[in-house]
């Protein structure tokens, strides 16, 4: 559509009509405004109370300043419940420097932006907007991401194309002065109270004219925020942020306020949100910690004491240097704490060293004076004594007190005992979940204020800052560094991310909170923590074990490796004397190392807790969904336990959704509104639909009304994030104040929400939590009522949730309401959970703190699922009046008929009364031996069976038709090939296309069917691991290869390798024939040259000699097609298998017990040149060990392996300099600092990267096998000075040893790409001309003094000091033209290249003089043959080209001078 066809109104309102400019990134819907996004003023920003932070997508990857893959390269097989915050963040600023010395009096350290901290005013809506979102029905396993990216504290800001262009065209200074955040606004004091402005919606110009703005500047902290007018700000960077702020906070705010449909309650919510936002910014003015101090020189020659200040709720990377005088006035207590830390006598360097025997245990009968901040209870003092007793014996243990008994306080107090009573000053490390980090910090501040405890979290820059300023007292010391802190508090994620840094420290004590996370001995977290050098370990968990004996073995083995053997499972369904004896023996062995106390035993003052199950009918809509789910999955249900586990589990999840709320299904809301409100989206209809469509919501609505009236405060737990969204909509429409916490809420906002809810004057009535994210160590005891909206498979998760309110410090009786839908799977799940709890506590009574050992998984197996699904299903097919019951529901009746549910039996640690206790809870199992045919009514059953039979008949007919079609197609192809008719082959393609999808499905299910995807996976695996015959089962198990039969993969592997050999053999044969033919022509041509029939100066460029030379140096990848996959590299396959086989044999035969001891011995490979890290022979050995361990191309794993020790010497994610890339194509000169954008600068990219590592490994493998001359390794490609020297002739290798030009794994280009593209990257130097052999990629063409680097695409001179004239000549010369011109005297060039090491000095001088004369004479005869350059200029080009063959580095001008001198002497 042309612009003229668009109306003026549309053009003036592009956001309203969905228009955007083509050169801009598409606007993304955002829930909260982030005014740092100054480059996209067309965003239509949506408000939502559910999301506190902005989702930011950084489209400019080259400006990313994070640690790289992230976290994408991190292992994620053991993930956390609450730490998946990757999508939340703050903008990144370019050229930000770390905190360092400043010379200005004010704070000039570049703080990182806090734009994401700006949660905006909520624009109230009159109806739900949930249908506009992508629905997420998943149970809240998003919290299960162990790798929570705490970079959400401060992530990247998406930079617009305009800003990128501006940044590259006009580089900003290190600390530019610009707008970081616009915080607030007010009317100018010169105006009246805005009588007119308040009644109209201002435009952007009015906002600029009439308001002042509170600005946070980019180069200063929030302490230096200033009020500015638009005119006083001037033209500074970030001015567009001011425009965005005006649109969002003034214009849109006024539009909402003037909307006649907006209620007073909505405006009140907006005002409260604005106040909350401003209160949050006030927090950024408060110093939280003083990190360091310095004496800075000012411009007037004086000096000033400055403090490096970390601000409250901001990360370490936003710390700034401030005038100490100002900070002393602002935060004197923090200054005192800093001084105390600087003068501390409990630094780790002052620790006592108990080498032989530790001091004997001395019981603490009273609370020692160094445990401050409160009074320990007797059982807590007992816990400290128990931990001290274990330490004295050198043992480790599990603190398994029930939730809410103060395990955190006991651990902190024990660390204080270690430091003050045993002089074990640290460093100690505590690993905790993200959600509990604030609670741990508060506990240290209260109970151990004298300890230096640092919180190790945040983005990469924050952690770098922590390591630089908080880790060592002497960070710049070359020798041993001394630790500065006593305790390091961190999360699981950073154990994995910074395993190398943290794992290199010797820790005196390690505590792991929520230690059931270590139940999987194969997880990356377990492996990482187990590799730490720790003197003592303590595991902390309120739910010691949740599944089986194997998990108990993992925990015990983590504490005391090899001390216990626990391998026998326990079956409580079939108990016998032998098993009972085993339990008692297990109890006896483990009892000393596990301390487990229950609240009922040790805390008599704790208020009671009552749990009630409230059963409610399904609504008509829910019943319809429930019934449809059962009938539409008839075939899967009838398979029962014989069927697939996952299919039944999916049905179970769908039924649980139907039991909760129909809005969890697509398009359900529209149907409900049609029923309850004639389809009208009014506020009343939306609220009525939300409530009346779900039985639980009807009950919850009445329950919350009653609870609020009685002054209670409520925690509502659900497993489903989407259910929390629905509850949030309900509370918002009802005008109920609430907080929310789930895996999508970033850490900073979590703490704010918890503190806001717990504050004495809080007006929050409800806290919405996901069962998992909200069930880990959070203290919400200001609430006295818990509502479990839907029960978890694992009863421990619900117990964790209840313990948020029922814990020490709670003063009120705690009521727990568990909502259950009648006659649904929820009732049976609850019953089975009840049995699990009874058994668990029975086992605890025997001393074995294992939970659900009778099942191997929390989730039931297929047989159990089938039984659970049948429960209550029959009632779904009978007519009911549930909807009428819901409309007439009486809360008192429901409460009177509620069932009391005991989740914490009155048993404790007593060994008495076990049998009697179990008898009290005997339950009658629901017999699930009936059939689905008995559940579903006969009429519907007959209909389902008819449909099922019809479907089977159709499938049979379809299969027969497909067979006939394939037979017909085969006959037609044979017929067409015989008749020579190629056009008819595709005549029936339309008919055939209908069966392709079914054939693909059939192949996917066929274990012996190998398709293109399997072939590609196999090809990549060969390039990575070499010979796969012995590891096929491992590759299939870990997902590297799709699941197919071993035998078929073995056959395919043999076929692929055979095809590769045949392809190489054929290529060799063809090449040999062509070379023989060209050699004959070249011989005849040489004869003509010798006889004078053809003059050397008149010979054409395209002559037989040139063609032969080009063919000899030609190097193209040998590609072949295999089973539909095109362009597989034959040479790479063959050579990789041989190389890796040689490496494996070498290490296994000599270093099988410890591969890390592998050594190159006396063989010294050629050193690398100009790599960014100090790369020696030792690093080469570690690199080969890494390839042996992880496979070729697994650079990330090799880099991250702390045992290899090359973590900081590999740079895989450095960003290329886009300016350098652009200029490299037009510049052949040596990069100089004065020429911006020419070549590669030292800051553009660090090496080695993936490509360099691949080439280095290729060289090392060939070096080991004796296939490379050590004088010219390929690993030096990419260095700024390439070695020159004589290069041996190499005979062409056999086919199975040759290699392709492009290393497939290491290069960013695909391995099977077109060969022509790879050939373009080859250097076109004279070495290829003079070499009579076909070159291997491991033996590159002898490098020119200025050649193209395949690593970065720029030309790099071997002689940086060469004159500018020579560089200019080489810039303009046509190297290809020079090569053709000089090809006639290739013998002389070749003789020069060979050098004269074995010759007498005089003899060599004579040869040099002869060959130089020959070259010079030829140049003189050819200098006028160029059409592009003048004779004199072309003469310089030819000499410059010839200088590359001189055996030493020499300028072409010197060669010209030498030739002129020889010529003059000859004339005389």
UniProtKB/Swiss-Prot annotation:
Q: Where is this region: Disordered?
A: 21-176, 974-1007, 1220-1247, 1270-1378
Q: Where does the record place Basic residues bias?
A: 95-111, 1287-1296
| Phenotype upon gene inactivation | Decreased sensitivity to the cytotoxic effects of 6-azauracil.
User: What is the designated name of this protein?
Assistant: Chromo domain-containing protein 1
Binding-site positions, ATP: 401-408
Q: What keywords sit in the KW lines?
A: ATP-binding, Chromatin regulator, DNA-binding, Hydrolase, Isopeptide bond, Nucleotide-binding, Nucleus, Phosphoprotein, Repeat, Transcription, Transcription regulation, Ubl conjugation
Q: Name one GO biological process term.
A: transcription elongation by RNA polymerase II
């Amino acid at each position: 559509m042309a612009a003229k066809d668009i109306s003026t109104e549309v053009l003036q309102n592009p956001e309203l009509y969905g228009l955007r400019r083509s050169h801009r990134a598409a606007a993304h819907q955002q829930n909260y405004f982030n005014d740092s996004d100054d480059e996209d003023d067309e965003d239509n920003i949506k408000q939502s109370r559910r999301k506190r932070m902005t989702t930011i997508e950084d489209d400019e990857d080259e400006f990313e300043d994070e640690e790289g893959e992230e976290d994408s390269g991190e292992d994620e097989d053991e993930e956390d419940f609450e730490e998946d915050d990757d999508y939340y963040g703050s903008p990144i600023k370019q050229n930000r420097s770390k905190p360092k010395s400043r010379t200005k009096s004010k704070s000039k350290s570049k703080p990182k932006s806090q734009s994401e901290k700006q949660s905006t005013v909520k624009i109230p809506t009159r109806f739900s907007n949930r249908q506009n979102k992508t629905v997420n029905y998943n149970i809240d396993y998003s919290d299960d991401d162990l790798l929570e990216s705490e970079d959400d504290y401060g992530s990247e800001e998406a930079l617009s194309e305009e800003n990128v262009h501006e940044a590259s065209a006009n580089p900003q200074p290190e600390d530019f002065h610009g707008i970081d955040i616009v915080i607030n606004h007010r009317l100018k004091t010169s105006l009246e109270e805005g009588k007119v402005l308040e009644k109209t919606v201002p435009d952007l110009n009015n906002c600029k004219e009439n308001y002042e703005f509170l600005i946070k500047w980019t180069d200063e902290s929030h302490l230096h925020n200033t009020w500015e007018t638009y005119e006083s700000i001037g033209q500074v960077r970030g001015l567009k942020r001011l425009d965005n702020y005006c649109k969002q906070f003034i214009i849109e705010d006024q539009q909402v306020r003037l909307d006649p449909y907006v209620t007073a309650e909505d405006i009140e919510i907006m005002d409260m949100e604005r106040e909350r936002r401003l209160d949050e910014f006030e927090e950024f003015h408060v110093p939280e910690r003083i990190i360091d101090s310095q004496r800075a020189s000012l411009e007037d020659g004086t000096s000033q004491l400055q403090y490096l200040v970390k601000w409250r709720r901001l990360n370490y990377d936003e710390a700034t240097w401030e005038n100490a005088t100002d900070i002393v006035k602002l935060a004197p207590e923090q200054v005192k704490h800093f001084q105390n830390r600087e003068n501390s006598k409990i630094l780790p360097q002052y620790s006592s060293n108990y080498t032989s025997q530790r001091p004997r245990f001395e019981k603490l009968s009273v609370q020692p004076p160094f445990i401050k901040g409160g009074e320990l209870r007797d059982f807590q003092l007992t816990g400290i004594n128990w931990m001290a007793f274990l330490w004295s014996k050198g043992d480790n243990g599990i603190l398994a007190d029930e939730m809410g008994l103060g395990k955190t306080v006991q651990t902190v107090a024990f660390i204080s005992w270690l430091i003050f009573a045993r002089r074990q000053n640290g460093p100690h490390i505590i690993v905790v979940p993200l959600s509990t980090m604030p609670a741990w910090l508060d506990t240290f501040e209260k109970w151990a204020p004298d300890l230096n405890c640092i919180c190790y979290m945040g983005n990469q820059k924050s952690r770098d800052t922590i390591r630089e300023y908080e880790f060592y007292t002497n960070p710049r010391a070359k020798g041993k560094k001394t630790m500065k802190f006593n305790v390091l508090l961190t999360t699981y994620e950073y154990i994995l991310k910074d395993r190398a840094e943290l794992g290199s420290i010797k820790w005196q004590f390690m505590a792991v909170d929520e230690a059931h996370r270590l139940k999987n001995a194969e997880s990356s977290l377990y492996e990482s923590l187990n590799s730490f050098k720790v003197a003592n370990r303590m595991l902390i968990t309120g739910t010691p074990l949740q599944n089986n004996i194997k998990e108990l073995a993992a925990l015990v083995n983590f504490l005391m490796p090899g001390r216990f053997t626990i391998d026998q499972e326990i079956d409580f369904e079939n108990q016998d004397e032998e098993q009972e004896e085993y339990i008692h023996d297990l109890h006896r062995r483990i009892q000393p190392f596990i301390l487990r106390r229950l609240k009922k035993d040790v805390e008599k003052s704790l208020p009671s807790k009552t749990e009630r199950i409230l059963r409610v009918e399904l609504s008509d809509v829910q019943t319809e969904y429930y019934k449809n789910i059962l009938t539409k999955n008839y075939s899967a249900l009838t398979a029962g336990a014989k069927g697939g586990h996952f299919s039944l589990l999916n049905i179970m999840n769908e039924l649980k959704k139907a039991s909760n709320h129909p809005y969890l299904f697509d398009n359900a809301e529209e149907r409900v509104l049609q029923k309850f409100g004639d389809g009208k989206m009014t506020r009343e209809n939306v609220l009525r639909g939300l409530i009346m469509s779900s039985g639980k919501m009807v009950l919850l609505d009445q329950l919350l009304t009653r609870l609020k009236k009685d002054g209670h405060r409520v925690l509502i737990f659900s497993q489903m994030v989407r259910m929390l969204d629905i509850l949030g909509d309900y509370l918002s429409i009802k005008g109920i104040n609430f907080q929310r916490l789930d895996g999508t809420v970033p850490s900073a906002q979590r703490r704010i929400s918890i503190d806001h809810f717990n504050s004495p004057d809080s007006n929050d009535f409800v806290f919405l939590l996901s069962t998992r994210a909200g069930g880990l160590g959070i203290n919400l005891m200001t609430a006295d009522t818990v509502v479990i909206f839907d029960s978890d498979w694992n009863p421990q998760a619900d117990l964790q949730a209840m313990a948020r309110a029922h814990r020490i410090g709670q003063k009120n009786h705690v009521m727990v309401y568990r909502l259950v839908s009648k006659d649904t799977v929820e009732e049976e799940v609850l019953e089975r959970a009840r049995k699990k709890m009874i058994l668990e506590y029975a086992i605890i009574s025997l001393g074995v703190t294992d939970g659900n050992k009778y099942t191997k998984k929390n989730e039931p197996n297929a047989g159990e699922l089938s039984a659970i699904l049948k429960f209550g299903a029959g009632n779904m097919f009978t007519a009911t009046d549930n909807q009428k019951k819901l409309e007439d529901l009486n809360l008192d009746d429901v409460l009177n008929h509620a069932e009391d549910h005991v989740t914490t039996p009155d048993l404790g640690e007593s060994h008495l009364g076990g049998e009697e206790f179990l008898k009290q809870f005997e339950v009658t199992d629901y017999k699930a031996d009936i059939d689905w045919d008995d559940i579903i009514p006969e009429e519907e059953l007959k209909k389902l069976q008819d449909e099922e039979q019809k479907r089977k008949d159709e499938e049979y007919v379809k299969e027969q038709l497909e067979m006939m079609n394939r037979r017909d197609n085969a006959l037609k192809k044979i017929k067409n090939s015989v008749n020579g008719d190629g056009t008819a082959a595709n005549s029936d393609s339309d008919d055939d296309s209908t069966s392709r999808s079914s054939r693909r499905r059939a192949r996917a299910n066929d274990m012996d069917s190998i398709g293109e995807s399997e072939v590609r996976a196999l090809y990549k695996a060969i390039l990575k691991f070499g010979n796969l015959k012995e590891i096929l089962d491992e590759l299939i198990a870990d997902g590297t290869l799709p699941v197919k039969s071993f035998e078929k993969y073995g056959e395919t592997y043999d076929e692929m390798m055979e095809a590769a050999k045949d392809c190489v053999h054929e290529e060799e044969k063809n090449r040999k024939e062509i070379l023989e033919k060209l050699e004959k022509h070249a011989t005849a041509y040489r004869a003509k040259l010798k006889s004078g029939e053809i003059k050397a100066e008149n010979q054409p460029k395209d002559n037989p000699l040139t063609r032969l030379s080009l063919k000899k140096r030609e190097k193209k990848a040998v590609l072949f097609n295999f089973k539909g996959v095109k362009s597989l590299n034959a040479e790479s396959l063959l050579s990789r298998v041989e190389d890796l086989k040689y490496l494996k044999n070498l290490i296994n035969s000599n270093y099988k017990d410890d591969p890390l001891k592998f050594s190159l011995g006396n063989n010294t490979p050629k050193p690398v040149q100009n790599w960014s890290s100090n790369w020696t022979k030792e690093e080469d050995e570690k690199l080969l060990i890494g390839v042996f361990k992880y496979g070729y191309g697994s650079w990330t794993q090799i880099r991250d392996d702390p045992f290899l020790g090359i973590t900081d010497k590999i740079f895989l994610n450095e960003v290329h300099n886009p300016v350098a890339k652009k200029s490299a194509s037009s510049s052949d000169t040596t990069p100089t600092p004065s020429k911006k954008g020419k070549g590669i600068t030292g800051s553009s990219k660090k090496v080695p990267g993936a490509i360099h590592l691949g080439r280095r490994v290729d060289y090392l493998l060939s070096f080991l096998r004796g296939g490379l001359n050590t004088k010219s390794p390929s690993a030096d490609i990419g260095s700024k000075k390439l070695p020159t020297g004589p290069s041996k002739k190499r005979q062409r290798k056999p086919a199975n040893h040759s290699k392709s030009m492009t290393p497939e794994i290491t290069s960013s280009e695909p391995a099977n790409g077109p060969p022509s593209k790879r050939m373009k990257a080859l250097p076109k130097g004279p070495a290829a001309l003079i070499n009579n052999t076909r070159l291997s990629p491991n033996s590159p063409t002898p490098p020119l003094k200025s050649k193209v680097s395949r690593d970065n695409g720029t030309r790099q001179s071997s002689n940086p000091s060469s004159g500018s004239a020579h560089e200019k000549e080489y810039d303009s010369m046509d190297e290809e033209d020079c090569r053709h011109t000089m090809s006639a005297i290739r013998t002389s060039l070749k003789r020069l290249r060979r050098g004269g090491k074995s010759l007498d000095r005089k003899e060599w001088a004579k040869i040099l003089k002869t060959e130089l004369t020959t070259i010079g004479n030829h140049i003189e005869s050819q200098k006028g043959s160029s059409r592009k350059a003048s004779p004199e200029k072309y003469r310089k080009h030819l000499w410059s080209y010839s200088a590359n063959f001189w055996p030493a580095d020499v300028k072409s001008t010197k060669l010209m001078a030498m030739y002129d001198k020889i010529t003059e002497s000859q004339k005389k």
